[in-house]
Regions:
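N-terminal pre-catalytic "stem/leader" segment of glycosyltransferase-like enzymes
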Residues: 1-38
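Membrane-proximal helix-turn-helix segments that form the acceptor-binding/catalytic region
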Residues: 52-73, 167-174
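Active-site proximal beta-strand in glycosyltransferases
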Residues: 26-56, 71-75, 96-99
């Protein structure tokens, strides 16, 4: 199984909506500098989606002489751009923000008083699943239920094989809670299709 996290999904959308002729003129590297070789005959772009404090970014960004290796730095949020700017003094004239987005807006489910409240959490387990499960233990309303699609498989089989075991305890805890339904990994398309059936998306932060 190949990774299909946010980076891969957005790259798919880029290839879907931008002409091949234009894309062939660029060399796009996502997040980790050097993951894709610099092409001297193309416009080299670093599409940065990771947080500024990731260890595998420090060697490149702390060396200001290397900042000229890319023609453009694209960030997925103003918050992320500002973090990189403050931390590494990157050349602002080479930076642009293109926000994350979606291409489908499902019809929103209208909640009716008295009906069960369905919550969904579909993030990787290190993004607050432990906090969320602790919160669910404090909820004694039988009409509030949480479906958990959390897994490491979104980043591919190799990553999952090396990482999933670290979170088995959390998954088991989710399975034991009466108001939580642990489902595990489902493809992006499935999550999009199911989203209108839920009342809230919960992201503990």
């Amino acid at each position: 199984m190949q990774p299909r996290g946010a980076t891969e999904l957005q790259h798919e959308m880029l290839e879907k909506h931008v002409s091949k002729e234009l894309l062939d003129q660029t060399q796009i590297c996502t997040s980790i500098p050097g993951k894709v070789p610099i092409d001297p005959n193309k416009l080299n772009i670093l599409w940065q989606k990771n947080s500024w404090d990731q260890p595998n970014l420090q060697e490149f960004f702390t060396n200001k002489k290397r900042h000229d290796e890319y023609d453009w730095y694209v960030f997925n949020s103003h918050w992320n751009y500002e973090k990189f700017r403050y931390a590494f003094d990157i050349p602002t004239e080479k930076c642009v923000v293109i926000k994350n987005g979606i291409d489908t807006f499902p019809v929103r489910k209208i909640y009716k008083r008295g009906t069960p409240i369905k919550l969904i959490h579909h993030c990787t387990p290190w993004r607050g699943l432990n906090v969320l499960l602790r919160a669910m233990q404090e909820i004694d309303n039988p009409h509030i239920k949480l479906d958990v699609y959390s897994s490491c498989k979104v980043y591919g089989s190799e990553f999952s094989d090396n990482t999933e075991k670290d979170f088995e305890g959390l998954y088991e805890q989710a399975k034991q809670l009466p108001n939580v339904n642990y489902i595990g990994y489902k493809p992006h398309e499935y999550i999009k299709e199911m989203m209108p059936n839920y009342d809230m998306f919960v992201y503990p932060s």
